[in-house]
Amino acid sequence: MQTRTEKGGKNSEGPIGTGLVIERRFTTIGEDPFDQFDWIEMDVEIRNADGSLAHRIDDVRLPSGFSGVAGKVLAQKYLRKAGVPAILRKVKEKGVPTWLQRSEPDHEKLQSLDPEKRFIGESHGRELFRRLAGTWTYWGWKHGYFEAEADARAYFDEMCYLIASQRSAPNSPQWFNTGLHWAYGIEGPAQGHRYIDPSTGELMTSTNAYEHPQPHACFIQSVSDSLVGGTDSIMGLWNREALLFKYGSGTGSNFSNIRGSGEPLSGGGTSSGLISFLKIGDRAAGAIKSGGTTRRAAKMVTLDLDHPDIEEYIDWKLSEEEKVSALVIGSNLLQSHADAIMDAIWSFDGEGDRLDMNDNRELKKAAAKAIKNHVPNSHVKRFLDLAEQGWKSIHFDKMDTDWQGEGYGTVSGQNSNNSVRVPNSFMDALENNGTWNLYHRTELKNASENGREPEPCRSMPAKELWDKVAYTAWACADPGVQFDTTINEWHTCPEGGRINGSNPCSEYMFLDDTACNLASINLLHYFDTDAQKFDIPSFQHSVRLWTMTLEISVLMAQFPSEEIARKSYEYRTLGLGYCNLGSLLMHMGIPYADDRAYAVCGALSSIMCGESYATSAELAGSLGPFPKYHENADHMLKVMRNHKRAAYDAKGSEYEGLTITPMGIDAKRCPSDLLDAAKSAWDRAVHGGEEYGYRNAQTTVIAPTGTIGLVMAADTTGVEPQFSLVQYKQLAGGGTLRIINRGVPSALKRLGYKDSEVTAIVDHIMGTGRLSGSPGLDPSVLKEKGFTDEVLSNIESSMPDVFDIRSAFSPSVLGDDFCKSVLAMTDEDCQNVFFDTLAHIGLSAEDIERANDVIFGYGSIEGAPGLKEEHLAVFDCATPCGKHGTRSIDWQAHVLMMAAAQPFISGAISKTINMPASASIDDIREAYELSHSTMNKACAVYRDGSKLSQPCLLYTSDAADDQA
């Protein structure tokens, strides 16, 4: 146990209890943690999808680190927009310190205000950060998590700092829901949620929406082969999903219990099959935005490979996308033929009846062409009938491939991530060119009840099914794969059942009907770029505090069903993770695709998970282990020992119960301080568990950190690499700033480059930003063409605001008078936003391109002056950089980075393996197989351009016309 000391060496004051001692590392006793920050003001507009103004928040005050995108996202997504009482009063509770008491509306004083001013929204970061940290502290204090009041105060201050400094952040549902009741007395009507009273262990029904918030982002829910009636029925699942989506959470289910197409029903007849039910759930999810108005519903659909409908399921999303393609083609074709027929009718100037095809030969040709191109006869007749009634034109809504458009809205299967569960037995059959059996669900049930082997309904070559998985993933990025055997070999609580599914992003994998609340730590904030050293003690401290926070969140939470409430209470799973690993590696001067990078990733993951379990053991010593610990103790301690063995890079024979040997930490490639901390964390985690057990069945995952990554201003999410060497930063006052990826100069200095060399390399990437020295556009050359000093000054002043040299020479920059009087441009030229002034003054396309590269940069480090060949890999990104870049990180490195982290993660890793458009189906297949052989639990692949909704330029429409 830690000693109770404050920052600066001052001892805490207060009575000694049984809870935890909280160290101060970032704050000082008696000082407001927010006084450490510079605060800025910004106005934030929230717009609807059509661009109309939905809401405006004026004078938002946030720490300066939240300028630009981070502040805009936080204000748009997480500030409470309404219902906050303008005047509050404290609610006294026995044993709760005044500073920690919850608040409620002071209705008497509110009456003195104008009605429209009585309830407002949040506009200050202090309100938001205190709402979160105060709620966690309040619940933790009431239930004995702190040894003394001084420890509770230290925890509150430290958590305020961790969030306000962008060192870490909880998942979105915490921001949406946590603290609305504690800070403002907001209640809201009850929605049917349930919770376990932490004092009595009794199941309770929530009396309002927010007293017990819904802070969990990730849910796994069971579903039975029953249409209605039970809590786990098919229709019951859609209801529970709606409750989760409403409060900003996501959910996943394994649907393998549902009968396949053609299986007999108890009441007679046969089943319509799995897909018919999945379509209903897909529609329901598509109609709901998570958190009310904040984001789309998040959903995972999983199916075992032995389900009789597995082939239809694998094809489902691709088949539906092909329907979208048909709708796009058909709607445009229909409009084209309607226009041609109407034009033939109304442009007819011959003798006879314009509607008689014997008289109007052009109409006959247009109608025949339409029918030949599969326009239904009934539509052609409709065109003629409308023309007879005087219609001159007909308008059809043209579909497009926008994923938010009507085309995608018409089809199913687009509101979920789809995955298949792959057991080792399938991989063995695949390796041995064997067959794979599919089973009716009723047969599996009957065989189990009768103690016999089930009879397959169909058999097929394993390779045939695997090829189908690879092809559809190549074509539309789904399905992903989850390796069932590996997942269950690392299961801490098998006495509670098998792990069947995951949350939408595949990082939370545990028992059905459980939930996980997430938080992520921004790794880059713990790296001192000047000293080139990672602050291990501060990272360990943050892990400890966040483990406590997520555990307290389980304590205070409500859930959408009785079963989830009870099992979440019994197992208390947590999801602590990190982001910005890719950025950290570049700052350290280490290539992403490098054994050193894998060692650093493994060590940091090991420290996080080991420290988190050590804290969980500490909590168990104070509060007791999770209720289902003792019946799973042997299993869990076995898993803990395997984690520890990976930290020590043990031999494969030393692991207990594993089919595949995990990737341990390579001691020769890992910094010694990280390696020592990684080993020490697991020494303490295993020892603490052996003595006290654990408070939580799981503690860590690697989540995608999408929105909260933006709030933390993280360059990279989860374990992803850098995406680009040039970044675009939105400014608080409007506009966009083009900046160098901050990892580039840091890495160059780390690699020993001098300041002058760093400047030259950065100029190569970003450009010089000035005309002087540029080919064909040096001021001396331009002055010969009549450019004045004033105009040249205007051009250079515009460069920070434009991204291309042509834009810097537009008439709006040069001035209409100069353009017309000196450059002999016409009024029409000046008003044409596409007019190429540089071509007008005699520069060739090659000249313009060369000048653009010098002034605005190549966007890539390739070819940079003075850069050593062996250092190129440090700056490789997920995709080639700039117009001329050719290098990018191979997909194998993505898989290996996941494999480096996975042995030290309780759950799994949410990550997409990025592949170029040129990737083959074999590449997809090999990525899945490498993921399995390196002991990853899941793998999702995205080939650039594989989604119909992604713009993919093959050639321009003009080029297409030229080819016609």
Language-model segments: what does each one mean?
Residues 1-957, 964:
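Extended catalytic cores of very large enzyme megasubunits
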